[in-house]
């Protein structure tokens, strides 16, 4: 989003007007954040530029919105004047959008102005750590080919046309979730698996300002559902919640717009953004996927790239030979999004793909309560832990943030059996680029 207003008046070059970048986690979408000019990303960090004379006020505002500042960095006035930023430790797709730059999740990445929106990948990085038993762990940080970032920005979005809008929740399920396919003909909107795009809904907010963009994980591979490089798809749930004061039902602006949009309608699209959830290039990598609800979107892109015949034909350089395991949490069986696709892959590739459901309102955990995804992880924690220890294994978590604590507890118990402290081991996984999280 090329929107300097998103950073509350950054870049005054007068004396004493130094600009700082706050890295913030835990921001939640609510009425007050809806009045800001930057989106609250589903996961990771939000980066906010703050002039020196507003640092205290911004700290108070962030605290009020439920955020926590985890780092503060400086941006020189000279860099602001030149329109450049060398602080590229951006770890979140919303930050990319707000800054109109690409990012790297764990490694600083500078955007090459001659690369037309493609950010150069970080160099391969060897991380040598010792586990709790003193054994050296050498892990290679994943390398990726050039990743397209911010090819279309809010001030000049791509205008896509809706091809189809299909329901994903079966009869008897809860809520509205749609699979929406857009025509990309006539543009240059390239993307890869694990990225997101921004959607700008029409109209203005209650303050009379144009609606802000919202970010959605892409649900199709780089070649599109038709494997013709002409489409992009989203998996969107209509946001619905009770107003905390009035008790009235409130519907999300953009999600309602998308879930009810008609084929043939034109939509403003920005992006793509994101590097946190990219699939490793190594076809022999193992991939653990832990998802709830629409968090299945990036997982679908991975599975299509790995197993769909047309995709494999379109990607002769990537023929998946590893092992993948999806643990998918939903409330009811009719809420298993893409159920037929998932089970078809499982039947066709039983040696390479394992599918496990956690159906909270139909299944019980060992304590007699509802079976949530973290309960399934606990059930299979020893197996998952052994797989995670393999240096070729990447773990992806996408969906509700509430599952993270339970997942960590389960893996902590499994690791402890071998004298390993999970929290330390997890840090090494993150540094090695093998632990990928996008939760909200």
Curated annotation (Swiss-Prot):
It holds the Pfam family CpcD. Keywords: Antenna complex, FAD, Flavoprotein, Membrane, NADP, Oxidoreductase, Phycobilisome, Thylakoid. It is an enzyme of class 1 (oxidoreductase). Residues 93-142 are annotated as: Disordered. PROSITE patterns: CPCD_LIKE (PS51441), FAD_FR (PS51384). Its EC number is 1.18.1.2. The keyword Zinc does not apply. Its cofactor is FAD. GO terms for cellular component: phycobilisome; plasma membrane-derived thylakoid membrane. It comes from the Bacteria. It is a peripheral membrane protein. Residues 17-75 form the CpcD-like domain. Its main location: membrane. NADP(+) binds at residues 217, 237, 294, 330-331, 360-361, 370-374, 399-400, 438. This is Ferredoxin--NADP reductase. It comes from Trichormus variabilis (strain ATCC 29413 / PCC 7937) (Anabaena variabilis).
């Amino acid at each position: 989003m090329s929107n300097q207003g998103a950073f509350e008046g950054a870049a005054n070059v007068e004396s004493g007007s130094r600009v700082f970048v706050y890295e913030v986690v835990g921001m939640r979408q609510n009425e007050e954040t809806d009045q800001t000019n930057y989106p609250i990303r589903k996961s990771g960090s939000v980066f906010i530029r703050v002039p020196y004379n507003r640092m205290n006020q911004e700290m108070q505002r962030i605290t009020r919105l439920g955020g926590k500042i985890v780092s503060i960095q400086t941006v020189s006035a000279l860099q602001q004047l030149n329109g450049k930023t060398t602080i590229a430790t951006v770890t979140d797709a919303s930050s990319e959008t707000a800054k109109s730059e690409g990012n790297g999740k764990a490694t600083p990445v500078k955007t090459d102005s001659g690369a037309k929106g493609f950010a150069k990948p970080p160099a391969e990085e060897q991380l040598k750590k010792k586990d709790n038993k003193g054994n050296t762990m050498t892990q290679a940080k994943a390398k990726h080919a050039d990743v397209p970032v911010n090819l279309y920005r809010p001030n000049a979005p791509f205008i896509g046309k809706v091809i189809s809008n299909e329901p994903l929740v079966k009869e008897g399920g809860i809520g509205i979730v749609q699979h929406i396919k857009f025509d990309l003909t006539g543009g240059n909107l390239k993307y890869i698996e694990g990225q997101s795009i921004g959607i700008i809904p029409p109209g203005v907010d209650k303050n009379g300002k144009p609606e802000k963009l919202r970010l959605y994980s892409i649900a199709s591979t780089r070649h599109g559902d038709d494997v013709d490089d002409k489409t992009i798809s989203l998996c969107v749930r209509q946001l619905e919640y009770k107003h905390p004061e009035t008790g009235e039902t409130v519907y999300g602006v953009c999600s309602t717009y998308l879930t009810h949009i008609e084929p043939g309608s034109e939509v403003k699209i920005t992006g793509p953004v994101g590097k946190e959830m990219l699939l490793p290039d190594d076809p022999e990598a193992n991939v653990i996927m832990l998802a709830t609800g629409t968090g299945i979107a990036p997982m679908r892109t991975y599975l299509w790239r790995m197993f769909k015949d047309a995709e494999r034909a379109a990607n002769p350089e990537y023929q998946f030979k590893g092992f993948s395991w999806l643990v998918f949490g939903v409330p009811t069986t009719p809420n298993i999004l893409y159920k037929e696709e998932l089970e078809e892959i499982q039947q066709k590739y039983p040696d390479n793909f394992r599918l496990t459901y956690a159906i909270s309102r139909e299944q019980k955990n060992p304590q007699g309560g509802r079976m949530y995804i973290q309960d399934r992880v606990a059930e299979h924690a020893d197996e998952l832990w052994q797989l995670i220890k393999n240096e070729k294994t990447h773990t992806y978590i996408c969906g509700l943030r509430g599952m993270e604590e339970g997942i960590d507890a389960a893996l902590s118990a499994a690791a402890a059996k071998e004298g390993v402290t999970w929290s330390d081991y997890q840090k090494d996984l993150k540094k090695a680029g093998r632990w990928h999280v996008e939760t909200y």
